[in-house]
């Protein structure tokens, strides 16, 4: 249950980041998580690339895919007067991503070795190091997002661009760059979460459905509120 809470929190952080920096809800967010699991499987199992090289390739892929996702979903409809356009586009993107995952890696769930092997025993309880690793990553991400939006100029610039792009451009904020950076960061967060999930829940397209808990968490905790998301994810 604790690990489920941590994974929900990591996914909620990605949603909050996109809401606060771009002002949109991404219904393909869960599929970005599944992409992280499939990317880990593709690199480490199908091509047998391990260690630091695999980590670098994964991070580069997540950043590049985030930029690609922004240019193909958000950017073409950013000026439309139909407010639901982006929601419809992300739902369509979700379907496309699922089909591509099955086309490239197959439709059967795949197993993958834990990123951090081993376990620690405490009485009758056995805790895998993979779970401890997940807890540590979740803590780092939570602090990083909080610092970004509450302490750094870059985060405030992202929030300003989300609230009023025209006014943000007038004071010199590069709105295209802030939006691109946001999508790259969100894709990386979701991809890392998916890679962490893969050894524990298998590599499968249904990982995308995990995002529903995160939607519920941010609704209960208040849109864009990290502290509220922590409570809501519980």
Description of each model-found segment:
Residues 77, 81-151, 177-181:
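Transmembrane helix-bundle core of multi-pass membrane transporters
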Residues 126-206, 226-232:
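Helix-loop-helix "hairpin" substructures at the membrane interface of multi-pass membrane proteins
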Residues 20-25, 64-108, 151, 208, ...:
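Short loop segments and helix-boundary regions at transmembrane helix junctions
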Residues 37-41, 59-65, 93-101, 137-146, ...:
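Hydrophobic core segments of alpha-helical transmembrane domains in multi-pass membrane transport
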Residues 21-68, 72:
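Membrane-embedded helix boundary and interhelical linker motif in transport proteins
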Residues 1, 5, 9, 35, ...:
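Residue-level signature of the transmembrane alpha-helical core
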Residues 1-11, 39, 48-54, 80-87, ...:
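Membrane-interfacial amphipathic/re-entrant helices at transmembrane-helix boundaries
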Residues 15-37, 51, 80-85, 154-157, ...:
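Short, non-helical or kinked segments that cap or interrupt transmembrane helices
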């Amino acid at each position: 249950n604790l690990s489920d809470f941590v994974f929900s929190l990591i996914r909620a952080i990605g949603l909050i980041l996109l809401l606060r920096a771009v002002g949109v809800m991404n219904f393909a967010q869960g599929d970005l998580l599944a992409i992280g699991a499939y990317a880990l499987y593709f690199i480490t199992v199908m091509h047998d690339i391990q260690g630091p090289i695999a980590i670098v390739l994964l991070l580069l892929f997540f950043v590049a895919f985030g930029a690609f996702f922004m240019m193909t979903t958000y950017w073409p409809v950013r000026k439309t007067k139909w407010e639901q356009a982006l929601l419809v586009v992300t739902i369509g993107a979700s379907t496309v991503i699922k089909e591509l995952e099955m086309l490239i890696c197959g439709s059967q769930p795949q197993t993958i070795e834990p990123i951090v092997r081993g376990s620690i025993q405490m009485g009758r309880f056995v805790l895998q190091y993979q779970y401890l690793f997940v807890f540590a990553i979740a803590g780092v991400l939570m602090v990083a997002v909080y610092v970004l939006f509450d302490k750094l100029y870059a985060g405030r610039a992202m929030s300003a661009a989300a609230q009023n792009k025209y006014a943000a451009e007038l004071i010199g904020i590069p709105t295209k760059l802030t939006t691109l950076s946001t999508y790259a960061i969100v894709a990386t967060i979701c991809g890392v979460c998916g890679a962490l999930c893969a050894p524990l829940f298998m590599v499968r397209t249904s990982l995308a459905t995990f995002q529903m808990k995160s939607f519920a968490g941010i609704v209960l905790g208040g849109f864009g509120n990290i502290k509220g998301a922590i409570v809501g994810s519980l």
